[in-house]
Amino acid sequence: MADDKKGQMGNVDDIQAKLDKRLGPEYISKRVGHGTTRVAYIEGWKAINLANQIFGFNGWSSEVKSVTVDFMDERQGRFTIGCTAVVRVTLSDGTFREDIGYGTVENDRRKSGAFERAKKSAVTDALKRSLRGFGNALGNCLYDKDFLSKIDKVKFEPPDFDEGNLFRATDENNELSRANTVTDHSEGPAPKKRNAPLPPAPRPGAMRPEAAHAAPAPSEPPLERPRSSENDQEDLLDDSFMFSDELQDDDLINIGSAKKAPSGVPRPAPPPPPRAWPPQDAPVAFVTAKAAPDLQAHGPVPPTHLFDPKFQAQSIRHTVDQTTSAHVKLSVLREKGIDQARDDIYSKFAPKGKILPPPDTATDPDPTLAARPALSAPQNLPTNTSSIQRPTMIELPKLHFPQPTAVPLPNVPASRREVGRPKQSPPSLRKPPPQ
C-alpha cells in the first residue's frame, strides 16, 4: 500500500514538474487583437497534444457541460451567431478544472455552417481555458506580459519533416502479422505435413473386368486432414485464385460428350477434334459487310468465321423484313387502329419548315407546295399612281410676341451668405473694439 502511494506521488511529482515549465516559442501563436495589439494564444490541437504528453492518453478526459446560443442575427442572407460553452476537464484521480468559452461567426452565408463553426470554436476555447488551470505548460504562462516580451526574442528552428515517423497502413498490417506469428509459435510446434501414401499401381494382369465387378473395393474411412496453422494456409495460396472460375469453351464442349468410365480401368483422353485454320500468313483485320464476301471468295476462311449477311439473332423479335425497303402495309396499320390514308399520316409529320394548314380548312393536295417559299415581287414592275393624291401643305399663321421691356432693379448691395455655417459677420465687417 505504501509502495502504491509512493509510486502515485512520484507520478504526481513528475506531472507537477512538467506543468511548472513554461511554453516554448514553437507552441505560441500570434493574432491581431483589438486595434494594433497582437495577442498570444495556443492552438487547440497543440493544447490537446500537450495534455496527452503530460497526463497520458488515458489520464484525462473532457466533458461539455452546456452550449448556449447567445444571439443569432440575419441580415441580407448572412448569419452572425454567438455561442457560449462550458467544458470540464477531469484527471484520472478525480481532479478537474471547469471554465467557459465563447465562439462567434460573422456574415456566414449558410446557417448550418455558422452554427457549426460557432459551437466548435466555443467548445475549443472552453477546453483551452480549462486546461490552462492546471499550470504554465498548458497555456497559463501566456497571460504573463513579462514572459511574452522575452519569449519573442527566443529563436527556434521549425522541426524537419520526418517521413519515417508517419503512421502508415503498412505498419498496422505488419503489427497484425507479427502478432499472429507470435501467437502461433507460442501455442506449440506446428504439425508436420504428411502426404497420404498412394496405393500401388495395379499390374496389367490384375486389370480385368471380371475381377473388378466380382470383388468390389472395400470402403475405407476418410482420412482426417491434419490442422494447419494460418501460415501454412498462406503458403498454399498460389496464382490460381487470381483467375476466373468460369469454364473454358473447350470444357463446355467436352462436358456433354464425356462418358463415365469404369472406376478400375483408366480411359485415355479423346483426341481433340480437327479444326480448319487459315494459313499462317493470312492477315487478320476487320472489314465491312460489303467487302466480306469478296475477301472470303479469294482466300480460305474457316466455316465458323464466314460472314452471313442474312443472319438474324434469335433473341430479337423481328416484325419487319429488314432485307427490303417498302411501305408499311395497310393491314398492319388497320391492326394498330390507324385507318387514315398514308398521305394524311405524312402530312401530319411534316418536314422542318413546312407550315401545316389548320384542321378545319381544306388541305393542299400537293404537300410540297406549302413548303415552297413565296416569290417576292420584282422591284422594277410599273405601278399605277394616277389614283394616289399628293398631300397638300397648310400654312399656319405666324404668331407675334411683344418684346419684353427692361425693368430697373433696385440698387441693393451684394452680400455673401455661406450655407451650412452659423450666421456671423466676416472679420472685416466686425466693429473695432473700443479704445
Swiss-Prot record:
The gene is RAD52. Involved in DNA double-strand break (DSB) repair and recombination. Promotes the annealing of complementary single-stranded DNA and by stimulation of the RAD51 recombinase. This is DNA repair and recombination protein RAD52. Part of a complex that includes RAD51, RAD52 and RAD59. It comes from Eremothecium gossypii (strain ATCC 10895 / CBS 109.51 / FGSC 9923 / NRRL Y-1056) (Yeast). Residues 206-217, 361-375 have a biased composition (Low complexity). One of its GO terms (biological process) is DNA amplification. GO terms for cellular component: mitochondrion; nuclear chromosome; nucleus. GO terms for molecular function: DNA strand exchange activity; DNA/DNA annealing activity.
